[in-house]
């Protein structure tokens, strides 16, 4: 049960079980943790690629750039280069898995510090996975820094709870990409790209904004009434799988209390607890089986630990990479696996005749919207000597340069011609 894993296991131990099907023994766990730690550093070329991004780049965009850059670093294990059978080797599969798990926290640390303008601390391979992640965020140049054990434990359990949750949008994207034979970095990057979407990975941030809008417990009855009247949306409740209480939500609520004991109580936790209490006592929500899910309390935990809301999805992507890799490995070893090709039901027009362009009228159904250039683009085009500028039809006209007017071409170019003649005569 997930409650037992959260209490007794660790993220990496549970990750081993996800990938290989069973919990490891002591020697297997030690080798697994060491292999992941050995692959935690990023190639310098990937670091340079990240450093070339804008300082205000979204952390998930930085994660995607890093993963895609890693795709170019190991051509000898890329099916498109080394041959389609390269992943038939379990040893090759396993090496790619530990590479990505090891590098996810390092990529995340670089994504975090892209906004701060500082470089993260180098990975500390003597620390646990979650402890090393916090170390890279906070140590700076102080290699004696040690994250607080309670915060490291909270981070580890949060990773464990988010590692995998059956088939979903991003996991399906990973398996879909893997079926074409792409390298594993592209498959995981595609999945992380799907997670970037606010309908998938941004639910805990939406919960936080909802609680902030409610403000205090006195406003909860009015909010719940608005939800029933379709005036408000209640985030963090309900799940496609769990029709009763999401067990992960109970665990995260306990983690929240542990974190608050250390860093101080977030006043929004009282709003969250009372909202949960009133919703669970309301027949409207009970009848619809709307109970708190994993996202309801996780944003409060992340905020209490000092993470900005735009970083929440990165904290989701780090552990979920293990789930993606488990599905990737499973699909590779499935003898019946073929390239995925979903069927589509076409509902458009059937056979039509080709109409010459001079006889066509403007489409009345669907057409490209007018794309207005920026003022900077208009400035550049105003100095462009080309004849046709379709964007200048909106009240803007370009004066014709003298050298384009036809009657003054000779005059306009005579100075250039004379200069060329003099240079040739002088041997230049």
List the predicted regions and their residue ranges.
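Non-transmembrane, aqueous-exposed alpha-helical and coiled segments at domain scale
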Residues: 1-395, 403, 419
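N-terminal low-complexity segments that are often proline-rich with Ser/Thr-Pro
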Residues: 394-427
């Amino acid at each position: 049960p997930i409650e037992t894993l959260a209490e007794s296991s660790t993220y990496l131990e549970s990750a081993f079980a996800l990938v290989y099907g069973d919990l490891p023994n002591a020697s297997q766990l030690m080798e697994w943790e060491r292999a992941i730690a050995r692959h935690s550093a990023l190639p310098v070329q990937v670091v340079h690629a990240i450093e070339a991004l804008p300082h205000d780049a979204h952390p998930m965009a930085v994660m995607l750039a890093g993963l895609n850059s890693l795709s170019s670093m190991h051509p000898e294990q890329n099916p498109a280069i080394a041959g389609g059978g390269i992943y038939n080797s379990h040893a090759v599969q396993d090496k790619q898995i530990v590479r990505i798990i090891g590098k996810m926290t390092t990529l995340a640390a670089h994504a975090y510090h892209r906004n701060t303008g500082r470089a993260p601390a180098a990975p500390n391979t003597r620390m646990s996975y979650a402890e090393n992640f916090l170390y890279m965020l906070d140590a700076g140049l102080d290699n004696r820094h040690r994250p607080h054990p309670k915060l490291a434990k909270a981070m580890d359990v949060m990773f464990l709870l988010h590692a995998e949750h059956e088939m979903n949008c991003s996991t399906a994207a990973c398996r879909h990409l893997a079926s074409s034979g792409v390298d594993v970095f592209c498959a995981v990057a595609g999945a992380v790209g799907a997670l970037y979407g606010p309908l998938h990975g941004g639910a805990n941030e939406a919960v936080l904004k909802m609680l902030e809008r409610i403000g205090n417990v006195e406003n909860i009855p009015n909010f719940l009434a608005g939800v029933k009247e379709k005036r408000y949306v209640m985030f963090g409740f309900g799940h496609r799988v769990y029709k009763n209480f999401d067990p992960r939500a109970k665990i995260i609520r306990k983690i929240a209390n542990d974190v608050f004991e250390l860093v101080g109580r977030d006043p929004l936790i009282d709003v969250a607890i009372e909202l949960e209490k009133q919703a669970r006592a309301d027949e409207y929500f009970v009848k619809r089986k709307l109970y708190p899910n994993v996202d309801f309390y996780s944003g409060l935990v992340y905020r209490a630990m000092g993470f900005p809301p735009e970083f929440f999805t990165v904290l989701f992507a780090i552990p979920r990479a293990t789930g993606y890799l488990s599905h990737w490995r499973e699909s590779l070893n499935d003898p019946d696996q073929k390239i995925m090709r979903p069927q589509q039901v076409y509902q458009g027009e059937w056979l039509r005749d080709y109409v010459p362009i001079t006889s066509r009228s403007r489409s009345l159904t669907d057409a490209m919207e007018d794309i207005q250039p920026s003022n900077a683009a208009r400035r550049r085009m105003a100095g462009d000597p080309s004849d046709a500028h379709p964007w200048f039809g909106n009240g803007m006209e370009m004066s014709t340069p003298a050298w384009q007017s036809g009657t003054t071409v000779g005059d306009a170019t005579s100075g250039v011609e004379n200069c060329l003649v003099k240079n040739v005569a002088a041997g230049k």
